[in-house]
């Protein structure tokens, strides 16, 4: 039964308070269909396996990720952006002093074709590229140069807002950033209220939290003074100025 729950589609019931009324929305996760989450095709077996199939079947002792590789020769390395590990590769290359750009349009490198948005890296050795590809399980194609237009990337200066009111989403947000090897700074109300945010940050991330928790926080008298309040109107004005100055504001859950 657990396998069916994890591998088949869950269908949330059409619950309504009254006929024709608004649907009763779920408060939390509504599905956990692993094939949809992981992009894996699953075929149910509805009858016993034949003797021939059982004879050819083998036990999988361990699951190994796809092997990474670097094909071709050159000092420029092109790789697909769709693999999660590609983001880790980008951060590692930039931290090591290499360069990474994003392709504006489809690239053709030898016999390999790369969709728009693919990464183009340089400033690293063939050995370093091989090590990255092998460790992260990504496939790179080496070439001497890429003539098509690309947009250079840089390591973003990331700030993550932390309310004094507990936020589960903040913990998950920090965890995701750490898994993908982004460096970030935790910002509390005082830092947001101090302003001049664009001087220190390129991206501000606000984890999913209700408006009152962010704007007002804990009320006076309910908690020690240093943990009272939210970003307030002055903090909101500073966020608007940050965006006007070219900063990127990510409001998760909006």
Enumerate the predicted regions with their spans.
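Intrinsic-disorder/low-complexity accessory segments
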Residues: 1-254
